[in-house]
């Protein structure tokens, strides 16, 4: 059962609408849908306790920059006695086409440094994740430059629709369980 949904991103207005902040966008939109506001958490990020489908769940956004995301996630999970298998980490993935959603129970970080840090600090790859497609990366772009670039105007409609689908997928992971959510959203 998912007890903590984490959105990965970078703090600061200069990163607000970049591909690397897709995780923040998902969790922010979920918070709006649920009518809750984030609170500061130990200078490491923001979080809020809420309910989805009658189940208590935390939403969290580490504000330590992407590469140090695990600091907040492991601290929050330890404090509330949440196992790595009960966490859903939402993040961008340049290997997936823009707007596609992929849910996995476990696996490697796949080159995503925030997820890599979380895996390292927990000492396990057994952490569910929701990967949000921000690709494909054009040949002329360096990966780091691409994920830190803003979405184009032409991508905005698809982005908004896809973020809503990702919010539904995250809710489904809590309400229906990972297997059913994967069957519904992994296409």
From Swiss-Prot:
Site feature: Stabilizes the basic form of H active site to accept a proton: 92
Per the UniProt record, which EC number(s) apply here? 3.1.1.29
Site for Discriminates between blocked and unblocked aminoacyl-tRNA, residues = 10
Catalytic activity annotated for this protein?
Answer: an N-acyl-L-alpha-aminoacyl-tRNA + H2O = an N-acyl-L-amino acid + a tRNA + H(+)
Under CDD domains, the record lists: PTH (cd00462)
Which N-terminal stretch is annotated as signal sequence? none
The answer to whether keyword Cytoplasm applies is yes
Q: Where are the transmembrane segments?
A: none
Give the superkingdom in one word: Bacteria
Residues recorded as binding tRNA, renumbered to this chain, are 15, 65, 67, 113
GO process annotations (BP):
protein quality control for misfolded or incompletely synthesized proteins; rescue of stalled ribosome
Pfam families from the UniProt entry? Pept_tRNA_hydro
- The reply to whether Cytoplasm figures as a keyword in the UniProt entry is yes
State the UniProt keywords alphabetically.
Cytoplasm, Hydrolase, RNA-binding, tRNA-binding
Q: According to its UniProt record, where is this protein located?
A: Cytoplasm
Q: Which GO terms describe its molecular function?
A: peptidyl-tRNA hydrolase activity; tRNA binding
Q: Which top EC class is given?
A: hydrolase
Q: Which GO terms describe its cellular component?
A: cytoplasm
Q: Where is the active site?
A: 20
Give the main location.
cytoplasm
Which InterPro entries did the record assign? Pept_tRNA_hydro (IPR001328), Pept_tRNA_hydro_CS (IPR018171), Pept_tRNA_hydro_sf (IPR036416)
To which protein family does this belong? Belongs to the PTH family.
Xref: NCBIfam families: pth (TIGR00447)
Described purpose of this protein according to its UniProt entry: Hydrolyzes ribosome-free peptidyl-tRNAs (with 1 or more amino acids incorporated), which drop off the ribosome during protein synthesis, or as a result of ribosome stalling. Catalyzes the release of premature peptidyl moieties from peptidyl-tRNA molecules trapped in stalled 50S ribosomal subunits, and thus maintains levels of free tRNAs and 50S ribosomes.
Q: What is this protein called?
A: Peptidyl-tRNA hydrolase
Gene that encodes the chain: pth
